[in-house]
Each structure stands twice: as structure tokens, then as C-alpha cells.
């Protein structure tokens, strides 16, 4: 039973990260132009896949925590890594709401990403960086057995915060460098945005 739950948990994580990284790459390639209808459909499909995978991760994660507690009720919740992973997944989930209701409508709008106002570009870049860092760090916590009962919550979250800040800096610099060739934007004017 536990092995099957772990398998489903890992499979959902792999599907999510793979889908997100491929979609990020596709968005980067289209940064100078408006997305086509096919690209928007692919983005919507990816969002649905990641949402379903996140639901599976929550269900299997809670199941694994329950199993772990019954196996070792005296000490299981003293493992600070569990609370750190829970915190990261909560942040990841809340950021998913931001991506869905803020970033997504901006990305599929009638402007290329690099034509959006600077504040929108920064928020899209930062929310994307937070998503990638959070997914990868949550997965790392899942395999970091040497952190069990050895690192405290604050230390783990400090590492996470450092990675998030690094992700924000990288996202900012990537967007800044991408704007250097802004005059060469190729806008796809043949797409009717009212049908999106």
C-alpha cells in the first residue's frame, strides 16, 4: 500500500515538473510575439495537468503523512523536514492561484510578454521562478533522507528562501536581457484575441 502511494506521489511530481519546464521553454521561445491559438491551448492543457497532479500530490502526501504517523506516532511529527515540505507545498499552491488568475491572463493577452508593462513582466517572471524553485525544492525534500531529524525548520526554510531569492534575481536578469532586442518584436497580428 505505502509503496503504491509513494509511486503515485513521485509520478505526479515528475509529470508536474516535466510539464512546467517544457511550458516555460515554450513561453521563452515565444517571448517576442503574441501566442498563437495552438500555443494558448497547450498552455491551458499544461495548467490542467499541473492542477490535477497537484491534487494527487496533496492526497498522496497527506496519505503518506498519515501512514508515517501510525508507524511512528511518538516521533514522526518531530521531523522538521515534514513541516518545511508542507510549508513549501502551501506556498507552491498559493502561487499557483496567482499564476492562474494573474500571470496566465497576461500571457495569453493581445501583447507579447516583452511588450507588457515592466511591473507585469517582473510579476510574471517572479511567479514563474517561485513556481519552479518550489516544485524542485519540494521534490528534493522528498528524497533528502539525511535531513530527517537532523535539520531544524528554520534552517531548511532559510535554504529555500535563498533559492527563491536567487530565482527572482535570475528571472529579473533574464527578462532584462531579453528586452535588449525589444525593437525586433514580431507580433502575430493574425490571431483574433476575442475568441480566446
Where are these regions (language model features)?
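Polytopic transmembrane helical bundles with strong interfacial aromatic enrichment
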Residues: 1-196
Amino acid at each position: 500500500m505505502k509503496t503504491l502511494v509513494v509511486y503515485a506521489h513521485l509520478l505526479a511530481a515528475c509529470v508536474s515538473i516535466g510539464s512546467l519546464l517544457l511550458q516555460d521553454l515554450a513561453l521563452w521561445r515565444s517571448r517576442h510575439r503574441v501566442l498563437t491559438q495552438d500555443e494558448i491551448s497547450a498552455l491551458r492543457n499544461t495548467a490542467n495537468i499541473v492542477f490535477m497532479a497537484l491534487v494527487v500530490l496533496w492526497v498522496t502526501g497527506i496519505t503518506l503523512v498519515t501512514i508515517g504517523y501510525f508507524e511512528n506516532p511518538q516521533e514522526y511529527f518531530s521531523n522538521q523536514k515534514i513541516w518545511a515540505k508542507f510549508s513549501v507545498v502551501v506556498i507552491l499552491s498559493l502561487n499557483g492561484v496567482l499564476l492562474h488568475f494573474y500571470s496566465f491572463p497576461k500571457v495569453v493577452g493581445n501583447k507579447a510578454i516583452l511588450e507588457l508593462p515592466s511591473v507585469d513582466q517582473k510579476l510574471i517572471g517572479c511567479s514563474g521562478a517561485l513556481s519552479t524553485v518550489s516544485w524542485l525544492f519540494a521534490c528534493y525534500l522528498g528524497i533528502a533522507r539525511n535531513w530527517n531529524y537532523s535539520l531544524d525548520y528554520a534552517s531548511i526554510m532559510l535554504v529555500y528562501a535563498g533559492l527563491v531569492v536567487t530565482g527572482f534575481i535570475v528571472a529579473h536578469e533574464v527578462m532584462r536581457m531579453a528586452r535588449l532586442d525589444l525593437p525586433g518584436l514580431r507580433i502575430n497580428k493574425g490571431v483574433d484575441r476575442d475568441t480566446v
